[in-house]
Amino acid sequence: HRIATALEIHHVLTRTDTGAWTIGPALAHFSTGTSPQLITAAGPIMRQLVATTGESVQLYKLTGDTRTCIAAEEPASGLTYTVPVGSSLSLAAGSAARVFGAFSLIDASPFPPNELATVRSTGVAESVAEREVGLASASAPIFDTNGQVIAVLSVSGPAQRLAPSPAQKVGKELKAAAKE
């Protein structure tokens, strides 16, 4: 336990909401097999998306039975939803999980088939107060040159600001950013 606590101080390990240990931000890009080029290329695009939408932006990579935040950008002011880099989140809820499910990268059974079809046809998933009360998000897939989903770009913030539909509110900007 003392070693794990020391590793937590250096961001090698972090604790989940349930108290379990998981990889921390210092190791996140290694464990996800993420190319440092993806994170480097995403940075300016994510900052522009924050400037355009005024909301928090995250980049997720599929890591086994969770999704891991591999990059995040926050607005300079206002109420934000922060996901620390290295955080592992469930694939049973949320707009990013829907994107992974829509493109058959995970078991999509938690989500209605018609919602997944909409994600595939529109290129955007949304979630309102699903993972956390008061939180809403919209997510879009990032494809590699072979047409495979390699990551998911998300915009998240207070549900009230993203009402009535996060996808309608930020979807156009989000899809454009995910294609860059």
Identify the function of each model-found stretch.
Residues 51, 129-135:
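Short loop/turn motifs at secondary-structure junctions and domain boundaries
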Residues 13-14, 59-60, 142:
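A structural signal for short hydrophobic beta-strand segments in well-ordered beta-sheet cores
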Residues 108-117, 121-125, 133, 151-180:
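Juxtadomain coupling helices with adjacent low-complexity linkers
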Residues 1-36:
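N-terminal helix-turn-helix
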Residues 22-107:
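Amphipathic alpha-helical effector-binding/dimerization core
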Residues 138-145:
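A short, hydrophobic, proline-anchored segment that marks a local hinge/packing element in signaling
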Residues 17, 63, 145-146:
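Short, ordered coil/turn segments that flank beta-strands lining enzyme active or ligand-binding pockets
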